[in-house]
Amino acid sequence: MTDNLDKNYIIALDQGTTSSRAIIFDRDANVVGTSQREFAQHYPQAGWVEHDPMEIFATQSATMVEALAQAGISHAQVAAIGITNQRETTVVWDKETGRPVYNAIVWQCRRSTEICAQLKRDGHEQYIREATGLVTDPYFSGTKLKWILDNVEGARERAERGELLFGTIDTWLIWKFSGGKVHVTDYTNASRTLMFNIHTLHWDEKLLDILGIPRQMLPEVRPSSEVYGKTKSGIDIAGIAGDQQSALFGQMCVEPGQAKNTYGTGCFLLMNTGDKAVKSSHGLLTTIACGPRGEVAYALEGAVFNGGSTVQWLRDELKIVNDAHDTEYFASKVKDSNGVYLVPAFTGLGAPYWDPYARGALFGLTRGVKVDHIIRAALESIAYQTRDVLDAMQQDCGERLSELRVDGGAVANNFLMQFQADILGTCVERPKMRETTALGAAYLAGLACGFWSGLDELRDKAIIEREFSPQLAEAEKEKLYKGWRKAVDRTRDWEDHDA
């Protein structure tokens, strides 16, 4: 518990794919200080993505100092630090020197594709799915770690001698901030490694054997809300969650059936399924989320590949808008899309279709179609894809969506939010506080150290800026959605490939 009433602030460290951020919250969950620093992206080969772990730590440390200075407060006034992070990104370091043996291999990196293919050939795909809730894909940490051990000179031998440690970004930051005293991760991050059994809540010995990972290099796995240790300056480190799970908690989606959508370049949808690890029949991931006090809960996760990137395409390639914000104005100028559907399968289709050979297409063109209709169809495509995933989630878990909570850059678009409510037939809630990912980490840390009393107090702080209620008649809604599904079907299996 917090023993000093003068400790009136929580720091959330939000370590993302392109930048490190620090956000300071007061007891009312208001932002009182922020700082952000970008860091270098390294692309040594096509499909490879790396970060320098030392640069990640340096930028994250600097943002904390800068945010404190901006807020005009000292370390002594901070009750705790919460950490949220880009998930799956993999770091291996020497536990004596604290130096990485190789750059961090980023979640986007595809270098372990052949390792995944071999796992499938060896018949491990089904067990991986059942134990971890994940698909056998280079996205996740386990095959990245295997690649480092297999390809960095001396790494496997040193790991087997107990000289090297593994961690996702949360683990790396805590180890550095604690001066090498604490080697932990939380259940949400562990559930993204392809090495953690989400049912037993332990590292899976069979998977470690399959991947050839020495058990002693893995961190201890702990709940998302507890005091793990202290920084060298004496601040409690008290909350950890992967970025999407942190946003789910920041949105107070802690009961079964509650869901959030983060509208970014793509869209990340998570639905809380409570204490039930639901196995998806629709290609969704089963993952660990945070329960009411940061304990283990489960969630279904689905990703839409092209959300905000569709609007970027209108702006940068077609050049029919100058600014993403303008799309709301143009889409609202026409009463509907005039029968036009844009399926933005630029890189294939994600959940629930999983068709890498689908390609983007524009349907329903007539001489009466204007640019405004195409812009509107682009925004509508984001909402349609969200419904695709949420329908799959509801079918998988049997939970009816109570409302959809939203965050990310595109939620400022009122047209999109209203159409989202219309096509779902469900209320869409946009929070006043847009920093939901950082807020989730702050909440987890604050609950652990007694800064906030519990869920009721946090719910009181969850102010909805605007609720979008469905306004479309059921028959019209289903007619529009039927057209979308027809359009999607026409894009499937488009690119030539070997059967």
From Swiss-Prot:
Keywords assigned by UniProt, alphabetized: ATP-binding, Glycerol metabolism, Kinase, Nucleotide-binding, Transferase
Catalytic activity: glycerol + ATP = sn-glycerol 3-phosphate + ADP + H(+)
EC number: 2.7.1.30
Example GO BP: glycerol-3-phosphate metabolic process
GO terms for cellular component: cytosol
This protein's record includes keyword ATP-binding: yes
Cystine crosslinks: none
Entry keyword annotation includes Transferase: yes
Activity regulation (record text): Inhibited by fructose 1,6-bisphosphate (FBP).
Superkingdom to which the source organism belongs: Bacteria
Binding locations of glycerol: 87-88, 139, 243-244
Pathway: Polyol metabolism; glycerol degradation via glycerol kinase pathway; sn-glycerol 3-phosphate from glycerol: step 1/1
Chain sites annotated for binding sn-glycerol 3-phosphate: 17, 87-88, 139, 243
A Gene Ontology molecular function term of the record: glycerol kinase activity
Binding positions (ADP): 17, 21, 265, 308, 409, 413
InterPro entries in UniProt: ATPase_NBD, Carb_kinase_FGGY, Carb_kinase_FGGY_CS, FGGY_C, FGGY_N, Glycerol_kin
Pfam families per record: FGGY_C, FGGY_N
SUPFAM superfamilies (UniProt xref): Actin-like ATPase domain
Sites where the protein binds ATP: 17-19, 265, 308, 312, 409
Function of the molecule: Key enzyme in the regulation of glycerol uptake and metabolism. Catalyzes the phosphorylation of glycerol to yield sn-glycerol 3-phosphate.
PANTHER family assigned to the protein according to its UniProt record, in alphabetical order: GLYCEROL KINASE, SUGAR KINASE
HAMAP family in UniProt: Glycerol_kin
The family this protein is said to belong to: Belongs to the FGGY kinase family.
Protein name: Glycerol kinase
Lineage: Bacteria, Pseudomonadati, Pseudomonadota, Gammaproteobacteria, Pseudomonadales
